[in-house]
């Protein structure tokens, strides 16, 4: 066993000496190529020294094998002299790989320099454009949220103050139509110096305000002439019940005087005439009034059923005066 170990140590020294000699001779390729047989003999001896210790499983042998393996890696040029050993091929590959690494490292360094130069050329554009555009947005968003009693609360924007000219123009357009198309809204906003959002919000508020007043019956047409009229769908029921309801008191009057019926008709017709006089300013009211006139035109169909009652009132109160036919004419 000791003899085998001594032979291994001797072989290790010989391989180290040959590796160092071939490392110095590696810079001269022709001489290295000429020394190929010597390299082959050295590689064969190293192979024999490597294969022998693998057969014995003792610790010193494995340590010697590991040391010879690392010495071959530390001196990769020693294996480059001979191509018979597998370690020689690996040593040459590692040597060329290290050379490629050096080349790629230099190329990478130049590429990095070019990239940084290109990045610095675009740096002024990025720093001047994007942060400037983002900062006002943050400034606009920050004041909208305020912490009140430990809870975030959104602060409302200040109310838009319209001038008298803008209000008059908006009111005139609202009298024409309560809903604006997109081109009309853009044109109106541009002419008044407002944004489209402001015009849209004004029309929405105006419509909601009018609907509330219309439902509650608080439409002061005489006190507030600027108040807009009702929607077209709601205008016919206003005039139609006026004509139909005034006929009911006459039928319910029975033996009442005809002059009283005439008074009721005249008093009932005065609010409708005032409303029609005010609503006549709106173009869409004429369409509604046309439908109302159609309803009034169908009303005379009820004359045959009511004529006996009217004649009865006429004969019964003939001594009081012939006011009943006049009242019937005013109602219908």
Swiss-Prot record:
- Designated gene of the protein: Dlx2
Listed Gly residues bias regions: 253-266
Listed Polar residues bias regions: 19-28, 55-75
The UniProt keyword set, sorted, is: Activator, Developmental protein, Differentiation, DNA-binding, Homeobox, Nucleus, Phosphoprotein, Transcription, Transcription regulation
> Quick one: where's region Disordered?
19-83, 219-272, 304-332
Q: What species was this sequence derived from?
A: Mus musculus (Mouse)
GO BP annotation list: branching morphogenesis of a nerve; cartilage development; cerebral cortex GABAergic interneuron differentiation; cerebral cortex GABAergic interneuron fate commitment; embryonic cranial skeleton morphogenesis; embryonic skeletal system development; forebrain neuron differentiation; GABAergic neuron differentiation
Main location, first listed in the record: nucleus
Function, in words: Acts as a transcriptional activator. Activates transcription of CGA/alpha-GSU, via binding to the downstream activin regulatory element (DARE) in the gene promoter. Plays a role in terminal differentiation of interneurons, such as amacrine and bipolar cells in the developing retina. Likely to play a regulatory role in the development of the ventral forebrain. May play a role in craniofacial patterning and morphogenesis.
Task: Please list the residue ranges that the record marks as compositionally biased, kind Low complexity.
Answer: 40-49
Can you name this protein? Homeobox protein DLX-2
| UniProt PTM comment | Phosphorylated by serine/threonine kinases.
Q: Which domain of life is it from?
A: Eukaryota
């Amino acid at each position: 066993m000791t003899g085998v170990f001594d032979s291994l140590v001797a072989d290790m020294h010989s391989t180290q000496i040959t590796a160092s000699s071939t490392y110095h001779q590696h810079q001269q390729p022709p001489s290295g190529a000429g020394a190929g047989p010597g390299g082959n003999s050295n590689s064969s001896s190293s192979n024999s020294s490597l294969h022998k210790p693998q057969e014995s499983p003792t610790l010193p042998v494995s340590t010697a094998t590991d040391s010879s393996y690392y010495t071959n890696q530390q001196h990769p040029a020693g294996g480059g002299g001979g191509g018979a050993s597998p370690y020689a091929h690996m040593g040459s590959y590692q040597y060329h790989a290290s050379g490629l690494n050096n080349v790629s490292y230099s190329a990478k360094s130049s590429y990095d320099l070019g990239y940084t130069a290109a990045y610095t050329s675009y740096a002024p554009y990025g720093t001047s454009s994007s942060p400037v555009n983002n900062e006002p947005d943050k400034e606009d968003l920050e004041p909208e949220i305020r912490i009140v009693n430990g809870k975030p609360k959104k602060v409302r924007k200040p109310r838009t103050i319209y001038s008298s000219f803008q209000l008059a123009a908006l009111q005139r357009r609202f009298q024409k139509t309560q809903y604006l198309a997109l081109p009309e809204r853009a044109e109106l906003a541009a002419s008044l110096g407002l944004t489209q959002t402001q015009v849209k919000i004004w029309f929405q508020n105006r419509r909601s305000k009018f609907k509330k007043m219309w439902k509650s019956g608080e439409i002061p047409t005489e006190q507030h002439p600027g108040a807009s009229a009702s929607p077209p769908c709601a205008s016919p029921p206003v005039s139609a019940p006026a004509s139909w309801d005034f006929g009911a008191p006459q039928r319910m009057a029975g033996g009442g005087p005809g002059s009283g019926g005439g008074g009721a008709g005249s008093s009932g017709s005065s609010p409708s005439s005032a409303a029609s006089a005010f609503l006549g300013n709106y173009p869409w009211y004429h369409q509604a009034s046309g439908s109302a006139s159609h309803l009034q035109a169908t009303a005379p169909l009820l004359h045959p059923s009511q004529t006996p009652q009217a004649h009865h009132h006429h004969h019964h109160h003939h001594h009081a005066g012939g006011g009943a036919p006049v009242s019937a004419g005013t109602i219908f």
